[in-house]
Amino acid sequence: MWDLARRLAGRMAATGLAALLTRREDTCPTEAERAAFANAAGADLVLSLHVDANRSMHAQGLATFHFGNGSGITSTVGEALAGFIHRELTSRTAMLDLGTQARTWELLRLTRMPTVRVEIGYLTNLGDRRRLLDPAFRDVVAEGVLVGVKRLYLQGQDDQPTGTFTFSDVLARELAREETAPAISRRS
């Protein structure tokens, strides 16, 4: 996951988003420590990239999670973000769709901002593991997560079909926006 997180952080930085990683390659903070870090940093969003394991080698697939409990309390922005990311990833990968689900896990519960956990397959499944070992697949996942985040901020301008919005498209939009921003501020 470290390599995938670095790929995503690089793409985020290239499109004007600051990415703070809660761990280094040689560390593994608890979910409570990650939540405390995000809260102290004043992050706008938290993305947790994760792979799963199961006793059954047949368990496979992709799922996204946001905060929500059985009493109807949910993070509406987290739910929307999880949905955008999930749709982008399922349309770009051949992974089994396990859906978007609400949970009360520590990281989702303790953060003060929308938080999404992305479960990108099972290391115990040969097909999922093979995909995760492929750098090109990790690029596809990083692009899908980035586009999902950008779609959250493009609501009302969401005119491109799911799975077709690329890193190059996002970068071009950001560059075009930067070029028009000075012209707008000069008119003020």
Mark where each language-model region is.
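Active-site-proximal helix/loop segments of hydrolytic enzymes
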Residues: 2-188
